[in-house]
Amino acid sequence: MSAKGGKKIQNARSSFDKNIAYDLAEAVEIVKRTSYAKFDASVDLVFKLNLDVRKADQQLRGSVLLPNGTGKSISVLVVTNNVEKQKLATAAGADQVVDGQTLEQKIKEDIFDFDVMVADPAMMPLLGKYGKKLGPKGLMPNPKTGTVTPTPEKAVEELKKGKANYRTDKAGVVHTLVGKVSMDTEKLVENIKTVISLIKRLKPSAVKGTYIQNIVLSATMGPGVKVKIEK
């Protein structure tokens, strides 16, 4: 990292108290103010949860529709051999609608010109053959995130409106996108409250003690800001 880049980080970190957990609106303002990226950075929310991720029922994974969108434009590909579903997906705003044969050719040629794939369930046996290619790129459709569905047009509509995925890692940490630094504070706050409410509802019944141990908000290039956990 350049000396200039290091100084930007130091200045950002010194502009607030990293040991304090801030009210949500104030935390958002700090994140917006301390983002030192030259582009419209993403805003990410991170939860440290008291989970035993070795147990299947404590592995949180899914997607959440943010009321004010993600602020990010995504390219959605739909794969289905059903002609009627292809028409509906196109009408819903899918960027690409392909059949299984076309998709297979794209994968073989390493053409991954899309951000999210939505699949008709009938396509999963085919996609399963390419899990080693799709999985590491985060492109394998999954029922838990709503990207394996008999109604792909609905998934396209939700993704275009602003749907964000979340997933627990091995340390019991959940990351999710909640917007862009250019968004109004009020809109970011509303998005974040939606995610926090969801995480609270998803608390596994077997969890004892403090469930949400820590919440941190940050921009792509910016310091993490602790968020006060409201009971």
From Swiss-Prot:
Disulfide bonds: none annotated. One of its GO terms (molecular function) is rRNA binding. SUPFAM superfamilies: Ribosomal protein L1. Pfam families: Ribosomal_L1 (PF00687). Coiled coil: none annotated. Keywords: Repressor, Ribonucleoprotein, Ribosomal protein, RNA-binding, rRNA-binding, Translation regulation, tRNA-binding. One of its GO terms (cellular component) is large ribosomal subunit. The keyword Repressor applies. Gene3D superfamilies: 3.30.190.20, 3.40.50.790. InterPro entries: Ribosom_uL1_bac-type, Ribosomal_uL1, Ribosomal_uL1-like, Ribosomal_uL1/biogenesis, Ribosomal_uL1_3-a/b-sand, Ribosomal_uL1_CS. GO terms for biological process: regulation of translation; translation. Belongs to the universal ribosomal protein uL1 family. Binds directly to 23S rRNA. The L1 stalk is quite mobile in the ribosome, and is involved in E site tRNA release. Part of the 50S ribosomal subunit. This is Large ribosomal subunit protein uL1. It comes from Mycoplasmopsis agalactiae (strain NCTC 10123 / CIP 59.7 / PG2).
